[in-house]
């Protein structure tokens, strides 16, 4: 058995059943749950993020939920620091850190560090180009000035290539290009010869998703409509009424929230908002699958299987996470 303490990663696309399995594991093992979700960090954003209810959170406390106001940003680097601290605290108490969520960049940050600039992402670039077409590059330059004033000062509004790259870097990691460059120098001593941090844990990586993609699509559509029935629009109305929030913030760009925000702005009909919200969620799931397909050492489980808990426990024993 490894001398390193154990940790469990439970990944998967949105609406796959990660939270239910995580809570079942928490009932069976001495675990502490740590959220790996870039939307669950925000207070007052409960329905549209499918945040566990207060009752469930009281029974199954999660670290890194409700730690930011929607007006604030939260980078992958900040997540890494917070998650490592939470994992260390759990280990010190003799418990197993169980990290659950679908923000794959956060998992990557934990396993590999954040020394490198993120690579180009065609979907993020397509989204930026669409915004530029609708709003103009000057509007995007103003957006960059809010999140990375140093880069905005260097980049002219009529330089779309560099402007797109700076926005892309921020959107992919939640940290500005300027900050990344500074951290590359400051954190260089913490990196090993391969250029990657080594996570000081023996990590078992579980992934859950329906075997059939159409099953996941149906679950996504059903859940989005349930969110609307549960008061999602009223939740976004409360955010929309705040003068310090706008559509360019990471919180409001979260899947579902941007579509309801546009509905409240009169840009979309109710039917269009519903359709686009479902489509955006499916696109998120597709991106998550793309990450997961490139992941190594994953143990996959079918969301619809009735024996995922015993299967997960059996796997954890085979990889020496459990005695």
Curated annotation (Swiss-Prot):
Domain of life, source organism: Bacteria
One GO-annotated biological process of the protein: tRNA modification
Keywords: ATP-binding, Magnesium, Nucleotide-binding, Transferase, tRNA processing
Gene designation: miaA
Documented EC number(s): 2.5.1.75
GO molecular function, one term: tRNA dimethylallyltransferase activity
Role of this protein: Catalyzes the transfer of a dimethylallyl group onto the adenine at position 37 in tRNAs that read codons beginning with uridine, leading to the formation of N6-(dimethylallyl)adenosine (i(6)A).
Name of protein: tRNA dimethylallyltransferase
């Amino acid at each position: 058995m490894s001398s390193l303490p154990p940790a469990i990663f439970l990944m998967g696309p949105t609406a796959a059943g990660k939270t239910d399995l995580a809570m079942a594991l928490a009932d069976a093992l001495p675990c502490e749950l740590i959220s790996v979700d870039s939307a669950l960090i925000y207070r007052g954003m409960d329905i549209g993020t499918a945040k566990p209810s207060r009752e469930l959170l009281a029974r199954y406390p999660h670290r890194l939920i409700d730690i930011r106001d929607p007006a604030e940003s939260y980078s992958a680097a900040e997540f890494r620091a917070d998650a490592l601290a939470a994992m260390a605290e759990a280990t010190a108490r003799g418990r197993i850190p169980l990290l659950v969520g679908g923000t794959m960049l956060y998992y990557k940050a934990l396993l590999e560090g954040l020394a490198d600039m993120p690579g180009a992402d065609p979907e993020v670039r397509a989204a930026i180009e669409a915004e530029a077409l609708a709003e103009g590059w000057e509007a995007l330059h103003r957006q960059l000035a809010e999140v990375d004033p140093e880069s905005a000062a260097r980049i002219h509004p009529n330089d779309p290539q560099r402007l797109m790259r700076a926005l892309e870097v921020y959107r992919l990691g939640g940290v500005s290009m300027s900050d990344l460059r500074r951290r590359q120098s400051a954190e260089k001593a913490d990196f090993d010869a391969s250029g990657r941090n080594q996570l000081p844990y023996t990590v078992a990586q579980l992934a859950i998703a329906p075997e059939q993609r159409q099953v996941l699509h149906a679950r996504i559509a059903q859940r989005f409509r349930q969110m609307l029935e549960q008061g999602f629009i009223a939740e976004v109305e409360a955010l929309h009424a705040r003068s310090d929030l706008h559509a360019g913030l990471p919180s409001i760009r979260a899947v579902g929230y941007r579509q309801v925000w546009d509905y409240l702005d009169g840009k979309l009909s109710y039917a269009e908002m519903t359709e686009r919200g479902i489509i955006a969620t499916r696109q998120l799931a597709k991106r998550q699958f793309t990450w997961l397909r490139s992941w190594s050492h994953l143990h996959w489980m079918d969301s619809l299987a009735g024996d995922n808990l015993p299967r997960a426990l059996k796997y954890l024993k085979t990889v020496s996470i459990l005695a």
